[in-house]
Structures are given as structure tokens and as C-alpha cells.
């Protein structure tokens, strides 16, 4: 059963980008969008950065060292972004499409669970902690913000990355939380394998009839 029937969704592939300019572009896009603006998905990998969510507490930053710490207005606590992690920003007009925040969170979690199942990885969501887990290890973090009835921020799926920076924090505020990644569970699988499935699953779950690939240029959001 699909959740909504919009006309299309725009897909933009950003490659490897620093966090702050992309975050600002997301804000600008959301502030400027109107009731007729198409929804968008942005696929990006970020240069190494710790981001503190709105609920973030300083004590969960154990020893950030040379990795910058950036305050974010997404939900949740501290997490790490770096190369080899697939971030997908979800900019959906909830009000126009009559989708609740809880519905969207569940759809994003199911998108990741279905994507991992494609690579024969069994995973699950947890009612007490947003995200997706393989056993007790976290493989995907999730954090959203809603403004003017529209979502931004999204998910971060560990695919083939250096997980050691997670040891410098309490991921998502949980001391000792262990992290998993796709490449350790499905050897040989990389970002280029994962992101088409991720998009396909999201589009299917939310009922978009068409995906339109467009270029991304930071200057368009200044």
C-alpha cells in the first residue's frame, strides 16, 4: 500500500560534499518552496564531520579530535558522517501529500530495511531508538526536521566507510553503541550498488510515478 500519489520526485546526486553548504542549501530550498514545488531527494557523501542534533548533549562528544563538530537543527543526538556513508536527504511536502511525520519516519526505515534485504542483510527498526539495526548494531541513522509542513534532513546508511570515528562519540546518545556497515555484511557491495536500490525502494513505498534526475549546483540555492 502506497502512502501518496504525487506527480514526480526530483533526484539530485551531489557526490562528496562538505556538510555545512549542503545543509544551508536544504534550508534555503525548504524556505523558498511553494505548494507546487516538486519533492526532492538528494544523495550525498559528506567529508568527515560530527553533527549535533537538536537534542544533542556535549557529554556525548567524547574526543572529536581533528574532526569538526557542527550544530544541526535535525532531530536526534550526535552522529558522524564521512566518505563511504550514503546520506539521503528527503524533502517532502507532508502537508500537500497528507503524510504524517510518523508515517514518513516508518517509510524511511522500511526503505532501508528493504534495501538491505536486497543484499541479503536482515535488519529491523526499534521503537525506542529511530534508525535501522542489524542485531544490536546500528547501520543507519535517521533525523528529520519539519518546517512549513515539509521535511528536510533524512538518513545516513553506513555502506563502506571507516567506522572508527564513531568511537569518538556516543552515537545518537547511546554509550557503547556499536555500528555496522553494508560492506562487512555483504562483501563487495559499494555505494554505487546501494543508492539505486535505496531510491527505488523509497519511490515505491511513497508511490511516486516518476523520478526525474536533475543536476545539483550549490549556487542555485544561495
Curated annotation (Swiss-Prot):
Residue numbers marked as site, Lowers pKa of active site Cys: 138
GO MF annotation terms: lipoyl(octanoyl) transferase activity
GO cellular component: cytoplasm
Location(s), subcellular: Cytoplasm
Gene3D superfamilies attached to this UniProt entry: Bira Bifunctional Protein, Domain 2
Gene: lipB
Keyword Cell division listed: no
Extra remark: In the reaction, the free carboxyl group of octanoic acid is attached via an amide linkage to the epsilon-amino group of a specific lysine residue of lipoyl domains of lipoate-dependent enzymes.
UniProt cross-references to Pfam families, sorted A to Z: LplA-B_cat (PF21948)
Keyword annotations of the record: Acyltransferase, Cytoplasm, Transferase
Lineage: Bacteria, Pseudomonadati, Pseudomonadota, Gammaproteobacteria, Enterobacterales
The family this protein is said to belong to: Belongs to the LipB family.
Top-rank lineage group of the source organism: Bacteria
Species in which this protein is naturally found: Serratia proteamaculans (strain 568)
Protein name as annotated: Octanoyltransferase
InterPro entries from the UniProt entry: aa-tRNA-synth_II/BPL/LPL, BPL_LPL_catalytic, Octanoyltransferase, Octanoyltransferase_CS
Sequence positions that bind substrate: 74-81, 141-143, 154-156
Amino acid at each position: 500500500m502506497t502512502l501518496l500519489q504525487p506527480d514526480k520526485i526530483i533526484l539530485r546526486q551531489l557526490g562528496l560534499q562538505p556538510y555545512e553548504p549542503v545543509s544551508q542549501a536544504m534550508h534555503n530550498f525548504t524556505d523558498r518552496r511553494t505548494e507546487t514545488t516538486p519533492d526532492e531527494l538528494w544523495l550525498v557523501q559528506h567529508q568527515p564531520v560530527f553533527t549535533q542534533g537538536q537534542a544533542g548533549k556535549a557529554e556525548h562528544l567524547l574526543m572529536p579530535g581533528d574532526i569538526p563538530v557542527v550544530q544541526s537543527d535535525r532531530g536526534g543526538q550526535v552522529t558522524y558522517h564521512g566518505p563511504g556513508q550514503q546520506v539521503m536527504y528527503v524533502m517532502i511536502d507532508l502537508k500537500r501529500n497528507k503524510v504524517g511525520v510518523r508515517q514518513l519516519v516508518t517509510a524511511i526505515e522500511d526503505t532501508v530495511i528493504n534495501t538491505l534485504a536486497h543484499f541479503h542483510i536482515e535488519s529491523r527498526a526499534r521503537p525506542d531508538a529511530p534508525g535501522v539495526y542489524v542485531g544490536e548494531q546500528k547501520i543507519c541513522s535517521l533525523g528529520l526536521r519539519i518546517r512549513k509542513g515539509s521535511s528536510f534532513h533524512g538518513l545516513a546508511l553506513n555502506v563502506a566507510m571507516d567506522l572508527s570515528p564513531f568511537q569518538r562519540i556516543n552515537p545518537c546518545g547511546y554509550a557503547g553503541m556499536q555500528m555496522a556497515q553494508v560492506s562487512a555484511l555483504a562483501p563487495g557491495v559499494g555505494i554505487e550498488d546501494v543508492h539505486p536500490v535505496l531510491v527505488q525502494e523509497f519511490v515505491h513505498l511513497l508511490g511516486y510515478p516518476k523520478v526525474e534526475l536533475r543536476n545539483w549546483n550549490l549556487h542555485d540555492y544561495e
